[in-house]
Amino acid sequence: MPNTHDFGPLVHISAEAVGNPGQRRFRLRALNSASESAILWLEKEQLSALGEAIESVLSAEEYVHQPLTADDTEPEPVFPLRPTVEIQLVQLSMGVNSESRRIVLIAADGPQGEDETHGVTMEFDYRNGFELRSQISRVVAAGRPPCPLCTAPMDPAGHVCVKKNGHQPH
């Protein structure tokens, strides 16, 4: 990727949804020590898959979460009004540096090798990974509940369940 911004180690990474259930957009917000920020827009399924991948890494690395004491709690980060980088994700890769106990994310807004593709690389420690995984779970679960029969999201205005009515739309 010729247009890649390396954020290095992050001081903060979080996941959030913007909008009402059924109309939500999902994003990761990242901030490094130089106050550079990134917003990575992604699909709900991508966010959920990232959370599962982080959970797998933490399990494989045998990470044991130690909650912060009240004295160690970090203040809420202040993000710049305009992010340094803002992209709609097309590709998201994750790696692990076991020596430094960091998770590495590589994100791009287009296919690898394209001249116009923009991307970011960033890394965060296992503690931030644990907290991000917990946050992703809450964000994803806060949407429309799945239908118990077909697992499609249930719309508050009504839900047509293909398993209940016996046919799928054409």
Please place each PLM-identified region on the residue numbering.
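Short, structured motif recognition centered on aromatic/hydrophobic residues
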Residues: 24-30, 50, 54, 103-107, ...
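Short cysteine/histidine-rich metal-coordination sites, predominantly Zn2+-binding motifs
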Residues: 161-170
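Mixed-charge, glycine-accented linear interaction segment located at domain edges/termini
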Residues: 37, 107-160
